[in-house]
Amino acid sequence: MDRRDFLKTVAITGAALTIQRSEAMEVLTQTINKANGSNPDLVAVMGGEPEEMFRRAISELGGMKQFVKPGQKVVVKPNIGWDKVPELAGNTNPKLIEEIVRQCFAAGAKEVVVFDHTCDDWQKCYKNSGIEAAAKKAGAKVMPAHLESYYKPIDLPKGKKMKKAKVHEAILDCDVWINVPILKNHGGANLTISMKNHMGIVWDRGFFHQNDLQQCIADICTLQKKAVLNVVDAYRIMKTNGPRGRSASDVVLAKGLFISPDIVAVDTAAAKFFNQVREMPLDTVGHLANGEALKIGTMNIDKLNVKRIKMSVSYTHLRA
């Protein structure tokens, strides 16, 4: 379905759900403490467009210059796995990617690269997601990831099930990288967020599914070159039939965004948010606890310094 047909379908069926009750912000932050005077560990934003929510969130963390230094080579790694238009929430929102790339250059980045190891045909995914055009508009280079020759072997000495992997050369060759997943349902992992987005930097994804998916997701996150920042796109959420989705009825317009250097914390906050769209207890998303056990982050967001932001007075009600 192309974008024109999708919009016609939504107009007729009202399938893309939206909400208008302020309880959504309480759900977003019901277990999160207020930030104190220092830069927060995690920022949760609701009620704006993807790019404006990111601008507000990154400013709360001290600006992009806290994470990207002049002259650095930067990778921005979205989820571009599926041949889907943005309205179907299969991939990271292109407006968010464009803004992040722009801010990387504003912070002095020498080069910004965008890529993902897609599931559908990579050229169709890059085009129809809108991410290729958005990234290039902001000045980024868009790299393919469909050939094994793009990947180099690394060791994962801290991994339990996965002890080695082939990782895309863009990650290995950059100075810093920013992880930008979309929050959505996943048939195997139950949720795909920042940690699972690492499967898009490796060549052999089949290994994950054959050797304890939830543990392997945590294992790949032990790689030495960790993302300096994790930005979770929760503007639209695929609540069912993920990761690919079937129709607009799978999508909820939530207008949320989570951002943190702590990958386990940001995924825990996003998972709590998703749980208000569709019941998804944290213990069913096993890679979160596995990641905490490997000491790559914390699930105990109650002890973190968290900033919560409302950007408007009207929200989407998330209780299905």
Please give the residue ranges for each predicted region.
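N-terminal and secondary-structure boundary signal
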Residues: 1-318
